[in-house]
Amino acid sequence: MTSVNPSSSKPSALILLPAVDVVEGRAVRLVQGQAGSETEYGSALDAAMTWQRDGAEWIHLVDLDAAFGRGSNRELLAEVVGKLDVAVELSGGIRDDDSLAAALATGCARVNLGTAALENPQWCAKVVAEHGDKVAVGLDVKIVDGQHRLRGRGWETDGGDLWTVLDRLDGEGCSRFVVTDVTKDGTLNGPNLELLTQVCERTDAPVIASGGVSSLDDLRAIATLTDRGVEGAIVGKALYAGRFTLPQALDAVGP
């Protein structure tokens, strides 16, 4: 079994984070983050356990109901984290002290803030200062008329200019950014390498790539950016759709 060690001294090894996006307890994938575009892939716990069995060292676990503000899967996500032996990055609807405390209490390795970083900058700065490496910030980007705009609340609202927000968060000491081109996510149309490169040029914090991965060649292309600051890649629909297996992906980007 080939795996990627996050603590490896070899900078070329890209960390892969299989995604488990959860709606009403089920693993789903969306197209461009649109509510109602779900394709269901069964139990969230079964999906997560499958990726662990196949060699994942990280899982990207997302509560889409909480992200869209239409409920939550809090108890289920806590159960999933508790049953996994691998590190979990937990995302979706973490916007205040209560939801943050619940997320951290699951024992996850890291939480991913999204909307909160856009709508409540002071709270976000406090959380980043208090929790350091346990907090990443998701930058969900939609390029509109050449402008890089951030999207919030399940990608339904405008969250301002990417570069302005990135500079602010970087100055506040954010330890890691998860960068998604929302026009690519769930489309299997390939990642936005230019966007990833541009973000890496603006921050020394590690970057996790998300959205558009459709092939092993896409992963290899992202892996060429590790020396620029791309640390990992979230892989979702390509795995669920059988474009490649996780062991194949780990082998493609491993040391």
Curated annotation (Swiss-Prot):
Listed Gene3D superfamilies: Aldolase class I
| Annotated GO MF terms | 1-(5-phosphoribosyl)-5-[(5-phosphoribosylamino)methylideneamino]imidazole-4-carboxamide isomerase activity; phosphoribosylanthranilate isomerase activity
* Superkingdom of the organism of origin: Bacteria
Catalysis performed (reactions): 1-(5-phospho-beta-D-ribosyl)-5-[(5-phospho-beta-D-ribosylamino)methylideneamino]imidazole-4-carboxamide = 5-[(5-phospho-1-deoxy-D-ribulos-1-ylimino)methylamino]-1-(5-phospho-beta-D-ribosyl)imidazole-4-carboxamide; N-(5-phospho-beta-D-ribosyl)anthranilate = 1-(2-carboxyphenylamino)-1-deoxy-D-ribulose 5-phosphate
**Pfam families named in the record:** His_biosynth (PF00977)
Which pathway is this protein engaged in?
Answer: Amino-acid biosynthesis; L-histidine biosynthesis; L-histidine from 5-phospho-alpha-D-ribose 1-diphosphate: step 4/9; Amino-acid biosynthesis; L-tryptophan biosynthesis; L-tryptophan from chorismate: step 3/5
| CC terms in the record's Gene Ontology section | cytoplasm
Enumerate the subcellular locations listed in this protein's record, separating them with semicolons: Cytoplasm
What are the EC numbers? 5.3.1.16, 5.3.1.24
What's a BP term from Gene Ontology annotated to this protein?
Answer: L-tryptophan biosynthetic process
Instruction: Report the InterPro entries cross-referenced here.
Output: Aldolase_TIM, His_biosynth, HisA/PriA_Actinobacteria, Isoase_HisA-like, Isoase_HisA-like_bact, RibuloseP-bd_barrel
Tell me where it mainly resides.
cytoplasm
Q: Which UniProt keywords apply?
A: Amino-acid biosynthesis, Aromatic amino acid biosynthesis, Cytoplasm, Histidine biosynthesis, Isomerase, Tryptophan biosynthesis
Q: Which residues form the active site?
A: 21 (proton acceptor), 140 (proton donor)
Concerning its family, UniProt says: Belongs to the HisA/HisF family.
Q: What does this protein do?
A: Involved in both the histidine and tryptophan biosynthetic pathways.
What NCBIfam families would the database entry show?
hisA-trpF
- PANTHER family tied to this protein: 1-(5-PHOSPHORIBOSYL)-5-[(5-PHOSPHORIBOSYLAMINO)METHYLIDENEAMINO] IMIDAZOLE-4-CARBOXAMIDE ISOMERASE (PTHR43090:SF2)
Protein's name according to its UniProt entry? Phosphoribosyl isomerase A
Native source organism of the sequence: Mycolicibacterium vanbaalenii (strain DSM 7251 / JCM 13017 / BCRC 16820 / KCTC 9966 / NRRL B-24157 / PYR-1) (Mycobacterium vanbaalenii)
